[in-house]
Amino acid sequence: MIGLVQRVKQAAVEIDQLPVCAIGRGILLFLAIEKGDNEKNGDLLIEKVLNCRIFSDQSGKMNLSLLDIRGELLIVPEFTLAGKIAKGKRPSFDMAAPAEVAKKLFDYVSGQIENKYKAVKKGYFGADMSVYLINDGPVTFWLKC
């Protein structure tokens, strides 16, 4: 399971030029499910995302979590994070989980996060989305669980 975590000032998702959801200060999480992933991988990723200290404290040190700042979280399914460009110029998605497995785990992860933290929005699995964001920093971390 791969999570691309971006600290944002704001982020939004549109589908067919219609707004779906938006957040203010917080984290934009792009989530990819790989072959072999399971709920345990999801649980590890959830704990990291909610508790990683990527927000600045009063002294400017990255010392506060999403929970500490009471920020918002936007989760966007992003299977291309599981892609590889090892040979040639065309990406291979051999490591990406099949769509039905990936959707089940995406729903599990987003549901578990929503149970733990209420300020959560999410994109739609399988949809072509436009994602808008204003990075804060920029601060971006790649998590593999």
From Swiss-Prot:
Its main location: cytoplasm. It is an enzyme of class 3 (hydrolase). GO terms for cellular component: cytoplasm. It comes from the Bacteria. InterPro entries: Daa-tRNA_deacyls_DTD, DTD-like_sf. It catalyses: glycyl-tRNA(Ala) + H2O = tRNA(Ala) + glycine + H(+); a D-aminoacyl-tRNA + H2O = a tRNA + a D-alpha-amino acid + H(+). Its EC number is 3.1.1.96. It is found in: Cytoplasm. One of its GO terms (biological process) is D-amino acid catabolic process. Keywords: Cytoplasm, Hydrolase, RNA-binding, tRNA-binding. SUPFAM superfamilies: DTD-like. One of its GO terms (molecular function) is Ser(Gly)-tRNA(Ala) hydrolase activity. Homodimer. Belongs to the DTD family. A Gly-cisPro motif from one monomer fits into the active site of the other monomer to allow specific chiral rejection of L-amino acids. This is D-aminoacyl-tRNA deacylase. It comes from Methylacidiphilum infernorum (isolate V4). The lineage of its organism: Bacteria, Pseudomonadati, Verrucomicrobiota, Methylacidiphilae, Methylacidiphilales.
